[in-house]
């Protein structure tokens, strides 16, 4: 006659056990600690330390222009001796047109270009503008994924703006330097070409022989000028802080279309 009371007694016993277990757990559990401002600052600091820094402006600009920069090399004979020159250029059209400085190619009978993907090609000089020291080359062999550079009006430049130069100084291919616009509307007789160039962009990003014909970029990696010359009072071809670039706005007659 007592069997009908066994289940309720067992259930009640289980409930009591659970309640006691919860009371013991709450008694033994450490009380939560209040976060201080220092705790929050330390947590934020640890998070920032584990977050990689964003790429630099020069890095972003270089990645934008990298597929469009070429090595320009010439071969010629002077006084019975083989002579070669090396400079830079920038692709301005999908058809393989390349903008560079005229003094880079001169009157050399053989001009070769090396694209970013390693494609090498002979090139023809299709446009010569000696009064601006500019030339346009046409490559005979093109990469499958040729990417022209984006041109931007140099009229938007201001003194103090950051600029980036890409070229091949002393044959060190695809070197990147950055600096600022030091002056606008400069006039200079280029030692390389002997031509008096006007309306030049003066900048202090390091350039040396091999940079000529390469692009001068804004922060977005757009071409605002073509590196043309450097000034050194000692008549040595090494950089001392003064470089000159031809504004991209002044290249319209060479490239056949205005910049963006």
Question: What feature does the model see in each segment?
Answer:
Residues 25-84, 101-102, 110, 253-257:
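N-terminal activation segment of mature serine protease catalytic domains
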Residues 28, 32, 78-83, 108-111, ...:
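Active-site loop architecture of trypsin-fold serine endopeptidases
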Residues 33, 37, 51-55, 63, ...:
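Solvent-exposed, acidic/flexible segments
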Residues 37, 41, 45, 58-62, ...:
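Extracytoplasmic/secreted envelope proteins and their assembly/folding machinery
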Residues 44, 70-72, 89, 95-100, ...:
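Terminal peptide-recognition signature
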Residues 53-60, 75-95, 119-122, 147-150, ...:
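A conserved glycine-rich beta-strand in the N-terminal activation segment of trypsin-fold
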Residues 79-82, 93-174, 252:
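Conserved active-site neighborhood of the chymotrypsin/trypsin-like protease fold
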């Amino acid at each position: 006659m007592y069997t009908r009371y066994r289940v309720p007694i067992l259930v009640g016993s289980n409930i009591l056990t659970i309640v006691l277990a919860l009371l013991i757990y709450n008694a033994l559990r450490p009380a939560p600690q209040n976060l201080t401002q220092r705790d929050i600052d330390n947590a934020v600091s640890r998070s920032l330390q584990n977050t990689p820094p964003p790429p630099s402006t020069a890095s972003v600009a270089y990645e934008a222009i990298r597929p469009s920069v070429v090595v320009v090399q010439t071969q010629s004979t002077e006084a019975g001796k083989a002579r070669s020159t090396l400079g830079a250029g920038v692709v301005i059209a999908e058809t393989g047109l390349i903008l560079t400085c005229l003094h880079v190619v001169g009157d050399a009978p053989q001009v070769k270009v090396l694209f970013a993907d390693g494609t090498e090609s002979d090139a023809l000089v299709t446009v010569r503008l000696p009064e601006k020291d500019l030339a346009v080359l046409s490559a005979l062999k093109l990469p499958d994924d040729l990417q022209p550079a984006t041109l931007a009006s140099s009229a938007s430049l201001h003194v103090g703006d950051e600029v980036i130069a890409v070229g091949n100084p002393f044959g060190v291919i695809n070197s990147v330097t950055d600096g600022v616009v030091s002056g606008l509307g400069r006039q200079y007789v280029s030692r390389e070409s002997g031509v008096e160039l006007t309306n030049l962009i003066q900048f202090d990003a390091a350039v040396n022989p091999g940079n000529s014909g390469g692009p001068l970029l804004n922060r977005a990696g757009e071409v605002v000028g073509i590196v043309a010359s450097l000034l050194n009072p000692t008549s040595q071809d090494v950089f001392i802080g003064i470089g000159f670039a031809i504004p991209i706005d002044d290249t319209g007659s060479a490239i056949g279309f205005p910049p963006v």
